[in-house]
């Protein structure tokens, strides 16, 4: 199974905190929200690949985050090419974008990149 983390929003509701920084990379409990999510996913043996879709504005932030990770799952950061709220694809548009770009034809576990949760 593959997993898609949605992180292509422009985080406008948390301005000015997120004006130049993506919401999924804000720290909660000493680490980014997206890292909490990734740690939960590492416990699911069926997940073999993880994609994170973001926009052009925040793409390099996620690349830097990925380069600092110490984990066993490879994450591919995908840039949807959008640069503002005006041309954003939206959640379902980004899902479709990644499915087509990666030719996904198997179950896909989709998670919002700014959602904290517990499986227990």
Task: Give the label of every model feature segment.
Residues 115-120:
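Acidic donor-binding/catalytic loop of UDP-sugar-dependent glycosyltransferases
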Residues 19-23:
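Short alpha-helical oligomerization interface
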Residues 9, 114:
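Active-site glycine-centered loops adjacent to acidic/histidine catalytic or metal-binding residues
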Residues 2-5, 13, 27, 31-111:
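Conserved N-terminal catalytic core of the sugar/cofactor nucleotidyltransferase
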């Amino acid at each position: 199974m593959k997993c898609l983390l949605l992180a292509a929003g422009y985080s406008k509701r948390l301005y000015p905190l997120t004006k130049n920084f993506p919401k999924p990379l804000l720290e909660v409990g000493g680490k980014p929200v997206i890292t909490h999510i990734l740690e939960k996913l590492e416990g699911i043996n069926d997940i073999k690949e993880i994609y994170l879709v973001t926009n052009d504005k925040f793409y390099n932030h996620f690349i830097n985050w990925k380069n600092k990770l110490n984990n066993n799952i490879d994450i591919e950061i995908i840039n949807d090419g959008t640069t503002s709220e005006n041309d954003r694809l939206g959640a379902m548009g980004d899902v479709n974008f990644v499915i087509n770009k990666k030719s996904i034809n198997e179950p896909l576990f989709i998670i919002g990149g700014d959602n904290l949760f517990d499986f227990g």
